[in-house]
Design a protein with these regions (language model features):
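Short, solvent-exposed loop/turn and secondary-structure capping segments
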Residues: 33-37, 128-129, 153-155, 208-210, ...
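Noncatalytic, helix-rich "gating/capping" subdomain that lines the substrate-entry/channel surface
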Residues: 61-354, 358
Length: 660
């Protein structure tokens, strides 16, 4: 048995009681002294691993770019890094891209142009993708989703707390039109053009569903035949748009429209708003999307708004970092194949499989002992749990990029080609059987996910590193950290939305009405708790949205509770009968190390501007509440740190939420 605790206590702030603020007790000294690097809005936690992964990917990319400049990776990276050519090209690449917009003489012509721009990887009025059909999860289907905004979310256009951001956005649009001279072609000053674009986007924002509505798996599943979209949503030529996209509506068949009222309203606006306004807005969408890839003056202005104003970031990322990011976005699996060959030992996968096995066993035991669930629902829950698919490290089959040809020295052409390649790949999958080997993240991504229609949990190689996963450390540290993350992802299968899918990934209820009512009662209590939380340093109006974050909060609470049970199981398999008998290491009991390790994993610090954006749009709670909001609902936390009535985190036993 190891005596390596896997944790250190140098950041502990002894002036903060664990029962008042466990997050700051564990991390207080770091939070008080750490300076966020100038080129990012947030630091700590996962960012250390992301820095490591980025450094490793850079080494691979630059080696390939130097030795094989004609390769896809070499062509894309070198074209991004060729600053001299980009500066010399000036506005010319953008003018070529917007020429079809300016030449669109009719709404139908413009609709075709918007589709072609979408094929080039540019966001437009409607977003689209193909993925597992929630009602037929063995096959891919085609989804249509609301889009068209330049601010993070529709709430920015209507809520008073975002007025300053809106004013800055209008100024930014005007500045971009001033730098490019593009407003003149419309007979407008930059200021007039900016106001017209903002008014246009505000009209679209009024039609958008909000972030809570968009979480509803049933409400956003609305099937239509592709051939009937013109009739169902009159005003926009969907058939022509789909054809230009590369998807023939006659063969496309059924499509899923996520927000029908948005599509109905946007289609009406397409004919009621003057064509000139639509063309100006379309020019703006291309300009804001391509600006980060253009000459320095536009790059800096884009960063000044999206980086500095919205996120508080003080300095743009070094060019190599942005270049690596561009390669990752376009060719993630191709570089991922190189990454895992060097940076993922097979032993990590073996250890992870043991952890996952214990987490699944702990979930099974927990479900079997739930006192609020009837036997009928319990059996369905256990059936779903038994069908979970676990993917660790990297895909068994890699995506084939051989049909993609990129051009050395032409960044914009490479961006268009990668966009079209992705579009064709996605469209070709419609109606085909789901490729069960597919991953939605690359191996070098520091993250993890659960996919409801596949009922699978996925852990890329890059997250399987200290402090989250340390194969040489004591079990308490690993179960408190990566164990909780595993439990969190499994927990998504049983959160307020994931619980609507059965074991085969089908969006179909398996609950009795009585049990679902009891489940809702417990989750509603969690919503109330989180609605009351305001991150330190923000005004009360920036409180957590308990409805938006509910799924992640259920995942956090379930993940922590079940990881603790799994730690108990691991101890028993080593002949240790109880948590109390776990070894004391570095002056801490096993249960203390478990909670301590978890709090260290969430140790992050955000700039206020970034925190304000994320509180509005991110379905995850701020990291301080991913610690404090969870532990106060777990009885063992009270025992481990002597938390009692009067402490800030104290909840009476009957107020503690217990779900899974």
């Amino acid at each position: 048995m190891t005596t390596n605790s896997g944790i250190t206590k140098e950041w502990v702030d002894e002036t903060v009681k664990p029962g008042d603020d466990f997050f700051r007790h564990v991390n207080g000294k770091w939070l008080a002294t750490h300076e966020i690097p100038a080129d990012r809005p947030k630091d700590g936690g996962l960012y250390t691993l992301r820095d490591n992964a980025e450094k490793h990917v850079r080494e691979l990319v630059e080696k390939i770019a130097k030795e094989q400049p004609e390769s896809r990776i070499g062509a894309l990276y070198n074209s991004f890094m060729d600053v001299e050519k980009i500066e010399a090209d000036g506005l010319e690449p953008l003018l070529k891209e917007i020429a079809p917009i300016l030449n669109s003489a009719t709404p139908s012509h413009l609709a075709v142009t918007l589709a072609l721009l979408s094929r080039a990887g540019l966001p437009q009025l409607f977003a689209w993708y193909t993925s597992n059909d929630p009602k037929d999860p063995k096959n891919y289907t085609f989804f249509l989703y609301q889009s068209g905004l330049g601010l993070p979310d529709e709430s920015y256009y209507r809520e008073e707390k975002h007025e300053a951001a809106c004013a800055a956005y209008v100024e930014h649009i005007a500045r971009m039109f001033e730098l490019t001279g593009l407003a003149e072609g419309f007979g407008l000053t930059p200021e007039q053009a900016a106001q017209l674009v903002f008014t246009h986007e505000s009209e679209l924002a009024r039609l958008h569903w909000n972030v809570v509505e968009n979480r509803d798996a049933e409400a956003t599943y609305n099937p239509y035949q592709a051939t009937e979209l013109d009739e169902k949503f009159p005003g926009f030529p969907f058939s022509q748009w789909l054809l230009a996209l590369g998807a023939d509506p006659e063969t496309l068949g059924q499509v899923i429209v996520a927000q029908p009222s948005f599509f109905e309203g946007a289609a009406k606006l397409f004919t009621s708003i003057p064509l000139m306004s639509w063309k100006l807005w379309a020019v703006w969408t291309v300009l804001r999307s391509r600006a980060p890839f253009m000459y320095d003056e536009l790059v800096q202005e884009s960063f000044n708004f999206y980086g500095k104003t919205l996120s508080g970031t003080q300095q743009i990322r070094e060019r190599w970092k942005r270049g690596v990011g561009a390669v990752e976005k376009a060719l993630g699996e191709e570089i991922g194949q190189e990454y895992v060959a060097v940076h993922f030992p097979p032993s990590h996968k073996e250890k992870m499989l043991v952890l996952v096995g214990n987490l699944l066993e702990a979930y099974r035991e927990s479900i079997e002992s739930l006192d609020w669930m009837t036997e009928a629902t319990r059996q369905k829950a256990l059936e779903k749990l038994s069908k979970f698919v676990t993917k660790i490290g990297y895909p068994d089959k890699w995506r084939d990029f051989s049909a993609l040809e990129l051009v050395p020295g032409d960044l914009f052409e490479n961006l268009r080609r990668t966009g079209a390649f992705d579009a064709d790949w996605l469209i070709a999958r419609k109606g085909q059987p789901v490729d069960k080997s597919e991953w939605l993240m690359t191996p070098q991504t520091v993250n993890a996910y659960y996919m409801p229609p596949a009922n699978e949990i996925v852990f890329p190689a890059a997250i399987l590193q200290p402090p989250y996963f340390n194969p040489d450390a004591d079990d308490a540290a690993n179960y408190g950290n990566i164990g909780m993350i595993i439990g969190h992802e499994i927990g998504h299968g049983f959160d307020d939305q994931g619980s609507r899918y059965d074991g085969d990934g089908k969006l179909e209820s398996w609950w009795t009405e009585e049990d679902y009512a009891k489940f809702k009662e417990r989750t509603s209590a969690l919503v109330e708790q989180y609605n009351a939380y305001v991150p330190v340093g923000l005004a009360p109006k920036f409180h957590v949205n308990g409805e938006l974050t509910l799924g992640e909060n259920i995942g956090d609470l379930a993940g922590m509770s079940i990881a603790l049970k799994a730690y108990r199981l691991a101890l028993k398999k080593q002949g240790i009968e109880s948590l109390a008998d776990a070894p004391v290491i570095d002056g801490m009991t096993g249960i203390q190390r478990f909670f301590f390790s978890n709090a260290r994993g969430w140790c992050t610090k955000s700039r206020p501007q970034h925190a304000e954006v994320m509180i509005s749009v991110d379905p995850h709670s701020p990291d301080e509440f991913r610690v404090n909001g969870v532990v106060r609902n777990i009885d063992e936390f009270y025992e481990a740190f002597g938390v009692s009535e009067g402490d800030a985190l104290y909840l009476a036993p009957e107020e503690r939420v217990r779900i899974w």
